[in-house]
């Protein structure tokens, strides 16, 4: 395979959940930039319409629909729509959509637990099941989960969130082993603190930001594009022998205690 083809996504199809903001938005644009056709979803219809219009103006090949990934019925509908748009073949699945609740362990409710498991773990597991026939039909499939460095270090207030991401990391390894026979690779990206709408309150709190940055060898928080570039690489032919891995994009946060 030529160098150009090894570093291209030309002609591929991708589903990116939660693609209207933050890391998901950056991944959508990164994949399109390397030649992929992308389908995305958001539970916020207004945000989705705004993004789709912006991408249309830029002549990006992106389509999408409203979907709350915590709903099994809506996930099934999403898979049907993706299959219809891409004629039953999908090369790339990016499980990015997720949720976050920050509380001390004794402050969590049963509803908090159910919500986080549904949106962070069950949704990814089920979407992999739904996408499997399409990924297999494409001949070369790549699944990328957006996990978190919180699954590798203990951070107060993150107990349930971190547990769901730890489960995602193990799911990654199981999928990699079971679906290699179908030429489907699975990897996880574990970001540290990234500048996204979901971390705005953290970034605004200068003391909290300073404390976090002090633990990062690079001395700053990350940008969504720094996660998106790895996501794109993991889906390329260049990464064809990489599977079952959890890769931190955290400026060295997890190696610094």
Swiss-Prot record:
Pfam family, one: adh_short_C2
Thermal response of activity: Optimum temperature is 35 degrees Celsius.
GO BP term, pick one: alkaloid metabolic process
Catalytic residues (UniProt): 161
Coiled coil feature spans: none
Domain of life: Eukaryota
Listed pathway(s): Alkaloid biosynthesis
Keywords of this entry: Alkaloid metabolism, NADP, Nucleotide-binding, Oxidoreductase
Record's catalysed reaction(s): (10bR,4aS)-noroxomaritidine + NADPH + H(+) = (10bR,4aS)-oxomaritidine + NADP(+); (10bS,4aR)-noroxomaritidine + NADPH + H(+) = (10bS,4aR)-oxomaritidine + NADP(+)
Binding site for substrate: 100, 149
Known tissue expression: Mostly expressed in stems, and, to a lower extent, in bulbs, roots and flowers.
Cross-referenced InterPro entries: NAD(P)-bd_dom_sf, Sc_DH/Rdtase_CS, SDR_fam, TR
Gene Ontology MF terms in the entry: nucleotide binding; oxidoreductase activity
UniProt family annotation: Belongs to the short-chain dehydrogenases/reductases (SDR) family. SDR65C subfamily.
PANTHER family on file: NADP-DEPENDENT MANNITOL DEHYDROGENASE, TROPINONE REDUCTASE
Function: In the Amaryllidaceae alkaloids biosynthesic pathway, catalyzes the conversion of noroxomaritidine to oxomaritidine, a precursor of haemanthamine- and crinamine-type alkaloids, promising anticancer agents. Can also, to some extent, catalyze the condensation of 3,4-dihydroxybenzaldehyde (3,4-DHBA) and tyramine to produce norbelladine, and of isovanillin and tyramine to produce 4'-O-methylnorbelladine.
UniProt-recorded name of the protein: Noroxomaritidine/norcraugsodine reductase
Lineage, broadest ranks: Eukaryota, Viridiplantae, Streptophyta, Embryophyta, Tracheophyta
């Amino acid at each position: 395979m030529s160098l150009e083809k090894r570093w291209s996504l030309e002609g591929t199809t991708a589903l990116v959940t939660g693609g209207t903001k933050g890391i998901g938005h950056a991944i959508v644009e990164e994949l399109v930039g390397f030649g992929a056709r992308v389908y995305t979803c958001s539970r916020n219809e207004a945000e989705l319409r705004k993004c789709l219009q912006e991408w249309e103006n830029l002549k990006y090949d992106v389509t999408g629909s409203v979907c709350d990934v915590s709903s099994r019925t809506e996930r099934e509908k999403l898979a049907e729509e993706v299959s219809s748009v891409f004629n039953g073949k999908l090369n790339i699945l990016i499980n990015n959509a997720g949720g976050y609740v920050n509380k001390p362990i004794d402050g969590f409710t049963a509803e908090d637990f159910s919500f986080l498991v549904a949106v962070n773990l069950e949704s990814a597991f089920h979407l992999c099941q739904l996408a499997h026939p399409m990924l297999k039909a494409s001949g070369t499939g790549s699944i990328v989960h957006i996990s978190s460095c919180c699954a590798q270090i203990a951070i107060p207030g993150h107990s349930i969130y971190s547990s769901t991401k730890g489960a995602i990391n193990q799911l990654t390894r199981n999928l990699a082993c079971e679906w290699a026979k179908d030429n489907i690779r699975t990897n996880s990206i574990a970001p540290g603190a990234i500048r996204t709408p979901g971390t705005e309150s953290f970034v605004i709190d200068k003391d909290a930001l300073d404390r976090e940055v002090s633990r990062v060898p690079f001395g700053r928080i990350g940008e969504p594009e720094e996660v998106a570039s790895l996501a794109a690489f993991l889906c390329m032919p260049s990464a064809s022998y990489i599977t079952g891995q959890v890769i931190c994009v955290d400026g060295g946060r997890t190696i610094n205690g």
